[in-house]
Amino acid sequence: MRYLIGIDMGTTNVKALLFDEQGNTAGEARCPSPITLLPDGGGVFDPEELWRLCCRLLTELLDAAPAEARSRLAGLAVTGMGEAGVPLDAAGRPLYPVIAWFDPRTEQYPAWWRDTFGEDRLYAVTGLKNQHIFTANKLLWLKEHEPQVFGEMRRWHCIPDYIAFRLTGASAMDLSLATRTLLLDAASGTWSRELLAHAGIPADILPPAVPSGTKVGEAVSYTHLRAHE
């Protein structure tokens, strides 16, 4: 019997679940998400705190798991909140707190897209009616209000693929999350150079968009997880 781990990086809770190939639960660990709520109704997360919490939950999960499960782990998948993400520098270090998906600081940008690009064209490319929550609007906010961070950024990861990156060293984004960036060409499933150029966002900061279930790399060892609790 092989075992699998699922991680859910949620806005309210972070959860790790161990289960067998028949879908039977063999273990669970959870903890409230470390969000800092702001007076204006926004919120932020510390990327390093999210990573440490993930390591702690995985350690708790595996410490309590049967020895058979620990020796027969076949895979690990990460899901979680959409739209929010982490700007990383050339060394893969976080440059700025995670802006929560619901944070209102980006409310001005749907009007910018409407006036400079057009709602109909935006919908034709992305399949989305623009809202302030989408990732592209967070990148526009960083470009306008944190130009040094924007200039030093070499990669943008949404939260689930940031955790996958920390676990594996591999850079990729699930297509379902990529659709929530407002930067994906929905017809081709690739990043829209038209939208990126219009927004002044470098195309190479976005990781490859891959289908759910794609193997992106090998996860770190149990010992490595314990060292990062």
Model-derived regions: residue spans:
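A short alpha-helix-loop-beta-strand transition element characteristic
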Residues: 68-71, 78, 120-130, 148-157, ...
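Glycine-rich phosphate-binding loop plus the immediately following alpha-helix
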Residues: 102-141, 186-189, 194-197
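Generic secondary-structure signature for well-ordered alpha-helical cores
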Residues: 59, 63, 115, 144-151, ...
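N-terminal glycine/serine-rich phosphate-binding loop of ATP-dependent small-molecule kinases
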Residues: 1-96, 124, 152
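Beta-strand segments within the central parallel beta-sheet cores of soluble alpha/beta enzyme folds
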Residues: 75, 154-158, 194, 205-212
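Conserved small/polar residues in nucleotide/adenosyl-binding loops
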Residues: 223-229
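Polyanionic/metal-chelating signatures
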Residues: 142, 163
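Short beta-strand-loop/turn "lid" adjacent to the catalytic site in phosphate-handling enzymes
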Residues: 65-101, 129-135, 164-185, 210-211, ...
